[in-house]
Structure formats: structure tokens, C-alpha cells
Regions:
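Domain-level recognition of nuclease-like catalytic cores that cleave nucleotide substrates
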Residues: 353-375
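Interdomain motor-coupling "hinge/lid" segment immediately C-terminal to the ATP-binding subdomain
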Residues: 50, 56-191
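Short glycine-rich substrate-engagement loop in P-loop NTPases that contacts/grips substrate
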Residues: 1-16
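Active-site-adjacent loop/helix micro-motif of nuclease/hydrolase catalytic cores
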Residues: 30, 326-336
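Conserved P-loop NTPase "ATPase switch" module shared by AAA+ and STAND
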Residues: 13-31
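Accessory nucleic acid-recognition modules appended to NTPase machines
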Residues: 141-314
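Active-site ExK catalytic segment of metal-dependent nucleases
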Residues: 319-327
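Structural recognition of the conserved hydrophobic beta-strand(s) that form the central parallel beta-sheet
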Residues: 21, 45-51, 82
Length: 375
């Protein structure tokens, strides 16, 4: 504190009242180590913010060859809060949608009755906007100021560029090009018919052993989420997940779209989501589920049977199909018909629909995905 007052003339530290905020904590690992002493001292509250704090190797950044020893993390002396981009509900609040409207949507879901047309159309429009804008605070703020998608896109591309800069700045030298190659391959991975993450898509001849750590770095940085294939459609889901068979989704839909072809935003706002083999739809639902704290799973068999997502809903395993059109859900129907094999009794179809039911399949509009809590 003495040094801080020397560096900030006029600053007054009042025990029990002063809160010290340390931004960009990753730039100075020693500052994080100092939290132990602030906690022990007890006179001042300290809030720290920063990116990449979850990345393996934090505190071992090497600027010189002789700087090999990392700094210690003050275990037990800090409370960690993971901050995510705005989820869809928060985006609704920012756009003036009241809690009463959201409660009404909950009731429509609970009673399985259609949402009135005026509200339904408004929610559809807002969801399309959320797909394009995403939840990064600066992007949302820019959108709310003038609704200029061009300006929003520039903000998003700046953020993506900052991600790439961080990869160069904080990763080990040997990993830097591989991390960037992994990151830049994500749109190509999702544009494939089979969206399973394939290392050969990064670079011809690439092997998993070369890129496993690079992909983990991007995930630890909070940029992507993995969606694991299940060996069987039974609970517990995590116990049936294949660690080496997975899809990768961007954790912010707006940033994902900013990495795609120019004009994609206009297509989405006009309701045209057929491009990229349904990846835009899948990514936004993965985005929504991830921000709810859900782990992501899907089901794929070599026979061609595939379901976009599986989750625990109302205490049981539930299939979730995401449709860019009012298409067929052949795999879901096959699984539901063969309960003795797959042990599944319910499914949800998300798409450009209103609320409805067809036997064991609950049909919902895309914008209701955020209401699908586990119980």
C-alpha cells in the first residue's frame, strides 16, 4: 500500500472502505501472489480482472531465458468468478424485455402452449440479432447505441485480433503457430458435413499429438467449448463421453460469425440460416447451453445415426435436434422407437417453430433454448 500511495499521489486508503481494483492481472503474476498478503492484512478489499487466467502455465510467462520460475497462485486466498459474455436472457434485458415477459415465456414452456404471435415474432427477431451480435459487452453496447451491424462487426473483428495477439503474447514460443492454426480452423471444422473436430482440417497430415495442447490452450482461455460424442445414450452423460471424439464450438456466436464470409450477418438477420451446413444454428445453441453451465454432448454412429445434442432435462436424458428448416428428425425418431436399445423417452426439436408437441417430441422456438434448465 505504501508503494501504491507513492505511485498514485493523492490516493487515500481507508481501512474497511477502500477497494483496490487491479486490471489485466495476467500482465503481472506477482500481483496475484500478493493477494495472499492483502487477505491476511484484511484492511482492504481487492478485485482483480484479467483474461487467460485459466490457461495452463499462467504465471510462467517467459520474457527472457533466465525467467523460468513461475509465481505461486494464492490457493485459499481468492474467490474466482468466471465472467462470460452476455447470455441471451441478459441480451433481452439490455433490449428492454421485462422479467414479466420472460416469466410468461416460462409459463408457455411449462404448459406447452404457443407464444402469442406478437411476442413470438419479437423474440425471434431478438434471437437473430443475438446470433449476429453475440454477448461481448463492447459489441452489445455498440449495437444498442446505433444498431449499426457494420460497427458491431468491426468491434468483433478487433476482439478476434486481440485473441490472436494474446496467443502470440502469452503462449510458449513452440505453441504459438499451432494455437493460431487451431483457432483459425474452427469455421472450416464447422462447415463440414461431419462436424467432428479433425486435426487434418487444421493442416494436411496433422496429428492429434501435435495439436492437443494447442486446442486445450484455446479452451482454457474460454474461447471455445467442446461437445463430446457419447458411446451410448444413457445417464450419466459424462461417464459415456468419448474424450477423443468431439466437436468444437465458439463460445460467442457473434465472434464466430465475424470469422465467416462477409455478408453472413445480413443473411442471418433476414432469417437465412441455411449456410455452413447448419453450423450457425448448432453454434448458437451450443453457445446458449454453455452459458447455462451445461456440458455439451452429441450422439453419432457410423451407421449415420446422429443427434445434435443430448442433455439431462427434467431428470432424464433428452435428445435435442436443432433444425435450420422445418426438416425431418429421422435419427431422433429411430432412437425413440427403439427404447429397449437406446433408453430414451423424450426429445426436443428447436427451430423456427412455436411451442407444440408431437408425441414424445416437444417442439420449441430457438429462442426458448435458454429456458431448458436441468430440472
Amino acid at each position: 500500500v505504501m508503494y501504491l500511495t507513492a505511485m498514485i499521489p493523492g490516493a487515500t486508503f481507508v481501512p474497511g472502505e477502500t477497494c483496490l481494483i487491479l486490471d489485466e492481472l495476467q500482465e503481472c503474476p506477482e500481483a496475484r501472489t500478493a493477494l495472499k498478503f492483502f487477505k491476511t492484512d484484511g484492511r482492504y478489499d481487492v478485485i482483480c480482472t484479467g483474461s487467460l487466467l485459466g490457461v495452463s502455465g499462467y504465471g510462467t510467462k517467459k520474457k527472457k531465458k533466465d525467467q523460468k520460475k513461475g509465481t505461486s497462485v494464492p490457493v485459499g486466498y481468492e474467490t474466482i468468478v468466471d465472467m462470460n459474455p452476455l447470455d441471451f436472457e441478459e441480451f433481452l434485458w439490455a433490449n428492454g424485455i421485462t422479467p414479466e415477459i420472460i416469466d410468461f415465456l416460462h409459463e408457455c414452456l411449462k404448459k406447452e402452449v404457443p407464444v402469442p404471435e406478437a411476442i413470438h415474432n419479437r423474440m425471434n427477431d431478438l434471437f437473430l440479432q443475438y446470433i449476429v451480435v453475440g454477448g461481448m459487452p463492447e459489441a452489445v453496447g455498440t449495437f444498442l447505441q446505433n444498431h449499426d451491424i457494420g460497427q458491431v462487426l468491426q468491434v468483433q473483428r478487433n476482439i478476434v485480433d486481440e485473441y490472436k495477439d494474446d496467443m502470440v503474447k502469452y503462449a510458449d514460443d513452440a505453441d504459438k503457430p499451432k494455437i493460431r492454426e487451431c483457432f483459425e480452423s474452427i469455421p472450416r471444422q464447422l462447415a463440414k458435413e461431419n462436424k467432428k473436430f479433425q486435426y487434418a482440417t487444421i493442416r494436411k497430415g496433422a496429428r492429434s499429438s501435435e495439436y492437443l495442447g494447442s486446442l486445450q490452450w484455446i479452451e482454457d482461455a474460454g474461447i471455445i467449448s467442446r461437445c463430446y460424442n457419447l458411446t451410448q445414450t444413457e445417464l450419466p452423460l459424462d461417464g459415456n463421453a468419448e474424450d477423443d471424439v468431439f466437436k468444437v464450438y465458439m463460445r460467442d456466436s457473434g465472434l464466430f460469425l465475424s470469422m465467416l464470409e462477409q455478408g453472413t450477418q445480413s443473411d442471418v438477420l433476414q432469417g437465412n440460416l441455411l449456410g455452413y451446413k447448419g453450423s450457425i444454428f448448432e453454434n448458437i445453441i451450443a453457445d446458449v447451453f454453455s452459458k447455462m453451465g451445461r456440458d455439451l454432448y452429441y450422439y453419432h454412429k457410423e451407421s449415420g445415426l446422429e443427434v445434435d445434442f443430448l442433455m439431462r432435462y427434467k431428470g432424464q436424458i433428452t435428445l435435442v435436434e436443432v433444425k435450420s428448416t422445418t426438416g425431418n428428425i429421422k435419427s431422433t425418431k429411430t432412437i425413440l422407437k427403439n427404447k429397449n436399445v437406446y433408453h430414451v423417452n423424450s426429445a426436443i426439436k428447436l427451430g423456427r417453430y412455436n411451442v407444440g408437441r408431437d408425441g414424445e417430441t416437444l417442439t420449441l422456438p430457438l429462442y426458448m433454448a435458454f429456458l431448458l434448465t436441468a430440472y
